[in-house]
Amino acid sequence: MLSRYNRVIEINGGNADISLPIVKFPPFKLRAQLIEKDPVVWLHLIETYVTYFEYLMQGANVELLDESTLDHLRLFLRTYLHEIADEEGKLLSLGINHDVSEQLYLLKGWIFSLIKKCGLLHLQIFGDSLWNLIKVYVRRNPDSIRGLIDGSLKPRINTQRVQLDKSYQVQQHLKQLIESGKFKRIDLRCVEDLLSAKSMQPNKFAENFFTANWIEILEALWAKGQGRGHKEARELIIISLFSVSADRLLKITKELGISNFETLALYPLLGTMLINEGVHKRLPDLKSKLLFLNLGGLSMDEGDHMSYPTSSGTEVNEEQLSALMELFPQFSKYQLSQTLLAYDNNIELVTNKIFEDPTIIEAFSREPAEEEVEPVSDGDNASFTEELSILDRGDSSKNKELDKKIISEGVPDELRNKTLTRALKLLYEADEDERDDTYDEADVNRSDPSKRIGLQEDEESYDTKDDSNEVRQDHNYHIVEAYLWNLLKEDPKLFERSKRGTKVRKTMKEMTSWSDEKIEGWCRMLERSPTRARLLEKKFMFKGNSKTGKTSYVHNRDSQNDGNVVKEQAKQKKSENIKKHEPQSTEQKKRQHAKNEKRKGARANHNRKKGHDKKLARAGNNAI
């Protein structure tokens, strides 16, 4: 008889997910303290890590990890690779335990085995972690690292993710390291091991790594020898060239569109390497693959300097000159023409020489010399005149009588002397003190007083100490200040120290009779005193409200009758004072009181404001 309740038992052959979290790898300082103070604890911790990875490598345990444990494992791998890669070149401890070293070596091996089993995508190793992986393992395992990067080493676990080529990521990461200034010698050694280390199999990784994109990255870093990472770019391209074959180099040049020297000039770093004799020795098949490199006749001295060929012709080939101007637009036409003359109109040889050492063309001046050397009358100075003729190197007609021996032997030394002279000139000009303009005032022309605003006073006006002298000085200063204020509003740079000696500054000094220091000090006073600047702005912005028109008397400042004018004014003042002190009648008092009431607006605060402005003007004049 069947039971009242039927039980259904479901049997599932699958395994449950494994939850086995792991902590991050300890940082450098903590590891150093554990080794120094408590190495036993550090040893047990490493043994635990080793046991953990041994368990993951058994069967399909790594595939059964749940999401949380897998995330912890990925975080541990990133921290471990970062710490071990950063430990290169550092002293962890003076005396490390042998057991600790052995367990660390085992842990390093188990981790690399796990990475090869799972692949880079499953463990999410990319960017900094990928480069740290290369730094840690490429020296002893170059083949495995290359297989992980290019995707040829397939993972042994069941994963649906496609293994992609990560060479481009490595190139971009190297570019970021160089641009940020974090590229070190150990990184350069890792690149060398990655590309050129001996392997059990044919090294196809270096061939695939050397791409047109890699050349463009290095060219951008080199920046015609002026970039921040030009040294690193030069070292990287040398390692890359020595790691590939001539056939691969030929393929890359075709991709870049390089077929002659004109197109090679678009890639100056690659062009510098391709015409180098050291590269030709390492790659003897290079000239047979790249036919435009077969120039021939390249004569080099045993020293560091090139030998200059003799020039049999005196006229420049215009077609070759135009081709050089298109190829090297940074140089002038005169420089290129003189270089062609020096190399007997051999455009291929000139192009090669400029690629090898651009200073040979920079030794020539950009324009022909305008000044001609006067002939020396003495007959013993014939050799000196010959040297001067070589130095001038003007038009081709001037060089017809030059001796070939003088050109071939004297030109290199002369070029070196010119380069050295130019370098010393730039060096001393950069540190030279500013020009002393103390005695420039003696050169100012003061003969024409009509061109200046501030006029000189006569000897009589200096002797007489009455009020008219102060009024005249205030009036002159007011006009000078208005003139300078208009210039300051138009262009404040006219008051800078660098404008000394210019035509504009000379005009300012003539119009104001002020020195350079006084003009510049007036501007600095306004910069440091905004209140003073606002007062001047009010003063000269609304000056149109002042009354204009004919006056009863115009001062003749240039005449010698100023003393008589002053005396007449003094007499008028005395007569007015006498009239004021005379007794007035009642009717006159009423009339005067009515006038005062009617014009009291012009007598009270307004007069005080004018007096205050005069006082500020005098204070500013004294400050300057």
Swiss-Prot record:
The keyword Manganese does not apply. Present with 6300 molecules/cell in log phase SD medium. The gene is CUE3. It comes from Saccharomyces cerevisiae (strain ATCC 204508 / S288c). The modification Phosphoserine is found at S377. GO terms for biological process: rescue of stalled ribosome; ribosome disassembly; ribosome-associated ubiquitin-dependent protein catabolic process. Residues 366-390, 435-469, 546-624 are annotated as: Disordered. Keywords: Cytoplasm, Phosphoprotein. Residues 590-617 have a biased composition (Basic residues). It is found in: Cytoplasm. Involved in activation of the ribosome quality control (RQC) pathway, a pathway that degrades nascent peptide chains during problematic translation. Specifically recognizes and binds RPS20/uS10 ubiquitinated by HEL2, promoting recruitment of the RQT (ribosome quality control trigger) complex on stalled ribosomes, followed by disassembly of stalled ribosomes. This is RQC trigger complex subunit CUE3.
